[in-house]
C-alpha cells in the first residue's frame, strides 16, 4: 500500500521524496507511522507481511525499512537476513512489543540500524529514520 498523498509532492528543493518502507501487521501501527512521517520529505510505502516487504525491496530502491519483528509467516529476524542478502546497506529500524535482551542481541547481530520497543516515542522514530537516510547517503557515496 502506497500513501499517495505523501508520494504526490516533491521536496521543497524539487527533488524526489526519499522512499521509506514500513512493515507491520497492525494497520493502526502502520497508519501511526505514516502520520508521524507525513511532515518529513519521505514517500512511505507499507506492507503487512515480511514477504510483501521483501518483494517491494527487490523492485524499489528504499532509503530505510521500518520492520516489526513479530509478523505472521516469515518473522522479522528471518526477513532481516533475506533483506541484508539482497541489499546489505539498507538501514533497518526494527520495532517490537516483545522485547528481551536475547531478541535485541539477535536483531543487532543480524545487522539492524536501530531498535525500538513498543510503545515508543514517535519523535524517536522520526529521528531514527532521518539518521538512517543520512547513513544510507554516506554508504552510497563510499561504494
Question: Whereabouts are the PLM-identified features?
Answer:
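Two-component/phosphorelay signaling modules centered on CheY-like receiver
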Residues: 27-45
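Acidic catalytic/metal-coordinating carboxylates
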Residues: 49, 75-78
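Active-site beta3 strand of CheY-like receiver
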Residues: 60-66, 71
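Short amphipathic alpha-helix used as the core "switch/output" element in two-component signaling
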Residues: 55, 77-89
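C-terminal output helix
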Residues: 102, 120-130
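Alpha4 helix (beta4-alpha4-beta5 surface) of REC/receiver domains from two-component response regulators
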Residues: 78, 99-114
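Short, conserved "switch-loop" micro-motifs in signal-transduction and mechanochemical regulators
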Residues: 86, 98-99
Amino acid at each position: 500500500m502506497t500513501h499517495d498523498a505523501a508520494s504526490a509532492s516533491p521536496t521543497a528543493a524539487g527533488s524526489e521524496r526519499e522512499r521509506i518502507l514500513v512493515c507491520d501487521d497492525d494497520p493502526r501501527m502502520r497508519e501511526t507511522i505514516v502520520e508521524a512521517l507525513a511532515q518529513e520529505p519521505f514517500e512511505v510505502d507499507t506492507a503487512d507481511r515480511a514477504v510483501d516487504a521483501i518483494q517491494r525491496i527487490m523492485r524499489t530502491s528504499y532509503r530505510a525499512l521500518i520492520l516489526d519483528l513479530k509478523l505472521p509467516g516469515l518473522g522479522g529476524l528471518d526477513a532481516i537476513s533475506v533483506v541484508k542478502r539482497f541489499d546489505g546497506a539498507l538501514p533497518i529500524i526494527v520495532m517490537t512489543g516483545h522485547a528481551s535482551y536475547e531478541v535485541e542481541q539477535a536483531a543487532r547481530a543480524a545487522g539492524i540500524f536501530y531498535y525500538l520497543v513498543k510503545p515508543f516515542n514517535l519523535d524517536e522514530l522520526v529521528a531514527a529514520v532521518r539518521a538512517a537516510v543520512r547513513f544510507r547517503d554516506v554508504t552510497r557515496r563510499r561504494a
